[in-house]
UniProtKB/Swiss-Prot annotation:
Key words, A-Z: Acetylation, Coiled coil, Cytoplasmic vesicle, Endoplasmic reticulum, Endosome, Exocytosis, Golgi apparatus, Lysosome, Membrane, Phosphoprotein, Protein transport, Signal-anchor, Synapse, Synaptosome, Transmembrane, Transmembrane helix, Transport
Cited InterPro entries: Longin-like_dom_sf (IPR011012), Longin_dom (IPR010908), Synaptobrevin-like (IPR001388), Synaptobrevin-like_transport (IPR051097), V_SNARE_CC (IPR042855)
Modified residues (N-acetylalanine): A2
Residue ranges annotated as Cytoplasmic topological domain: 2-188
Biological process terms in GO annotation: calcium-ion regulated exocytosis; endoplasmic reticulum to Golgi vesicle-mediated transport; endosome to lysosome transport; eosinophil degranulation; exocytosis; natural killer cell degranulation; neutrophil degranulation; phagocytosis, engulfment
Name the UniProt record assigns to this protein: Vesicle-associated membrane protein 7
Length: 220
């Protein structure tokens, strides 16, 4: 389960975006953005196995796409965080910005927050207040039909292969680092055991050799 795609837009004008994996996100997002009214609103659209969550405030839309089994509370926590960071960074500039004007800067913020909110499953239990729970109850979920320009039914197509490859590389790197760390830990433990053994033998043998300088055992 993960947040698959996130976008910040003014109406249908995309200002910044980030995708967790490959897919026809932009084609689908354009259809969704065209259906979102300009007044302040929060809503979840349901389409197939995916959910489209959005917050619209001051004509700026903060939208993300998730699997249908991804917790809505986590999705809206993500959107609220993105909204706060975007408003703090750009303010009123977003009202007149050109398409993708903030993408070079803000896409990295989307990527970092997308990863953070996707991986931290305990986030809701820590951050979510009763007010947020009540707010979530008021956010409706609506089914939506998407139609491509050619009139055919539009489906969200996702290619997670690239992400799986990245995950495999990350897993191998993590495994190597873990093996290296375990090797160093075992080496340190071996050295400590050897030192302790030498000290122990020295303490045992010293009385038998007449003291700590071993006068009776060391020939002059």
């Amino acid at each position: 389960m993960a947040i698959l795609f996130a976008v910040v837009a003014r109406g249908t004008t995309i200002l910044a975006k980030h995708a967790w994996c490959g897919g026809n996100f932009l084609e689908v997002t354009e259809q969704i953005l065209a259906k979102i009214p300009s007044e302040n609103n929060k809503l979840t659209y349901s389409h197939g196995n995916y959910l489209f969550h959005y917050i619209c405030q001051d004509r700026i839309v903060y939208l993300c796409i998730t699997d249908d089994d991804f917790e809505r509370s986590r999705a809206f926590n993500f959107l609220n965080e993105i909204k706060k960071r975007f408003q703090t960074t750009y303010g009123s500039r977003a009202q007149t910005a050109l398409p993708y004007a903030m993408n070079s800067e803000f896409s990295s913020v989307l990527a970092a927050q997308l990863k953070h909110h996707s991986e931290n499953k305990g986030l809701d239990k820590v951050m979510e207040t009763q007010a947020q729970v009540d707010e979530l109850k008021g956010i409706m979920v609506r089914n939506i039909d998407l139609v491509a320009q050619r009139g055919e039914r539009l489906e969200l197509l996702i290619d997670k292969t690239e992400n799986l490859v990245d995950s495999s590389v990350t897993f191998k790197t993590t495994s190597r680092n873990l093996a290296r760390a375990m090797c160093m830990k075992n080496l340190k433990l071996t050295i400590i055991i050897i030192i302790v053994s030498i000290v122990f033998i020295y303490i045992i043998v010293s009385p038998l050799c007449g003291g700590f300088t071993w006068p009776s055992c060391v020939k002059k």
